[in-house]
Structure formats: structure tokens, C-alpha cells
């Protein structure tokens, strides 16, 4: 949970903190993720919308992934300002809760969208006959709406969390729970999200990718080479996202929440735990940067869309008005198809 972002040193004998490390790492990495995520996903979303006449189920998932990423990266600058000001929140209680909420909506929407894409790509390759009826744009929209509703509702406790204040009555954001009752509630939420939001999807993609790889090995690589490349690209990017962004974060969060329940916390253990939180939470936020790679390497159609978009853009730049009786430009014809 994002409230585990900063662990307060509770040992009376420990006066060291990682505040400087935390503020520098978070402000630097969140700034980089904001820029890369905003321009990467913004560009992909712009191209997909401009070429929306070329509809596909894969495109529906890509659009939803890009929207989820953009909603998250738009709140990351608030975190950057917070850590630049050394842990003083300047934007009010609601934006504090919204910033936490947006990160987790993005995190689990990304996991579920990637899982859905992997499942339907598996159906398309392993069961090509059933693929005709199962992998459709309409079903993809239905799945995406279901994912949004589920994640938005299950993440709602972050919007209802009580604000925290320091001794100077400044609003504190992204802090760990202090009272035992809140710690227990957070622990329950953690295990629900761990199993439903990470372990089950991870098992699904492992099964799907195993079936895809076995099927591709049986088939001649010369046949459907484009489809094979897209499948391999998706396997590489999604696996990297799970291993780099999602898995370290969920493992560390489990350890951290149980660590909070310990009455005695050695100083060196507290400092190591704090640093591990900073690193893994930053890696979790970096999933926004993986998704543009997924669009490019696993979506052959996306590269065709990009080519169409570039041709249309060039034709718009070089377009010279003609008489009404003249034929339309080639770029205009492509855009209207």
C-alpha cells in the first residue's frame, strides 16, 4: 500500500533517517517516470485515436492501458513537489488521497489489462478456431469496462483514508499507518490485492505463455511469422513488467507490513526497510514506462498505424489547396478508409 511509502523509525535508540535518500530518489525517479510515461503513452494514445478506423481487440486494450498510465503520471508531479519540499504536502487532503488512489488504480489496471491481453493472445494462437468468436472488439470493450469498475471500487478505501498531520499540523502524505486497527485493515487489503491483483494474474500469464511457446514450437516459424513475433514481443515485455515492477513491490510490501507489527525494530533493519520501500515503490510506478514498449513490440498493427499516421501527417504538411473538381490527396484517402 502506498501508505507504506515512508517508514517512521520507531526505535528510541535510532536517530538516523533516510530522508535525504528518500527525497532525492523519489523526486528524481518520479520526474523521469512522469516525462517518459506522459510522452510515451500520450504519443501512443494519439496515434491510436488518429487511426481508430482500424479497429481491433488489441487496440482496445492498448488504449485503456495508455489512459490508465496517463491518469497516473499526471499525479506523479504532485509527489515530486512533496519530496522536493522534504515531505511537506501543499495540495490539500483530497489530492493527497487522490494521488495514492491513482497509483493503485494504474498498478492493478495495468496488471489486469496485461493479463487479459495475454489470455486472448493465447486463445488466438492455441485455439485459432475459437478465436473468431472469442477475441472480438466488443468482448474486449466489455472486459475493459469490467476491469475499470472492479479496480475503481476495490481501490476506493484510499479515497476515504483519514489525513495525517505532523507536530506542526502539516499534512503528511504516503505515510505508513500508525495505529494497530489501521495496520490490520491495511494488512487485509494487502492480502486481497496480493492474491487477486498479482498472484492469480501471474499464474494465468505463466500458463498462457507456456501454452503459446509450446504451440509456436510445434508450428513452422515460416508460417504466420508476424503473429509469432507479436506473441514473443508480448511475452518479453509483460514478463519484464511483472518481474521488474510488480513482483519486487508485492514481495517487499508483504515483508514491510509484517515488519510494522513488530514491537522492537533494530535501527539497521528499519533503515534497510525504508530504502527497500523507496526502491520497490519506484519500480512499481515505472510500469507506466513498460506499456509503450508493449504497444510497439507486440503490436505489429501499431507499427502499421504509425506508418499510416506518418503518411497522413506528411500529406497534411505538403497539402496544397486545389479546385473542388480535383481528386483528394493520397494521404486524405488513407485517413478516410
From Swiss-Prot:
Record carries keyword Ligase: no
GO cellular component: membrane; plasma membrane
Disulfide pairings: 96-173
PROSITE patterns, per the entry: G_PROTEIN_RECEP_F1_2 (PS50262)
Keywords for this protein: Cell membrane, Disulfide bond, G-protein coupled receptor, Glycoprotein, Membrane, Receptor, Transducer, Transmembrane, Transmembrane helix
InterPro entries xref list: CLT1_recept (IPR013310), Cyst_leuk_rcpt (IPR004071), GPCR_Rhodpsn (IPR000276), GPCR_Rhodpsn_7TM (IPR017452)
Record's subcellular location: Cell membrane
Main location: membrane
Alphabetized GO MF terms: cysteinyl leukotriene receptor activity; G protein-coupled peptide receptor activity; leukotriene receptor activity
Other facts: Selective antagonists, such as montelukast (Singulair), zafirlukast (Accolate) and pranlukast (Onon), are used in the treatment of the asthma crisis.
Family: Belongs to the G-protein coupled receptor 1 family.
PANTHER family recorded: CYSTEINYL LEUKOTRIENE RECEPTOR 1 (PTHR24231:SF45), PURINOCEPTOR-RELATED G-PROTEIN COUPLED RECEPTOR (PTHR24231)
Name of this chain's protein: Cysteinyl leukotriene receptor 1
Lineage of the organism: Eukaryota, Metazoa, Chordata, Craniata, Vertebrata
Encoding gene (name): CYSLTR1
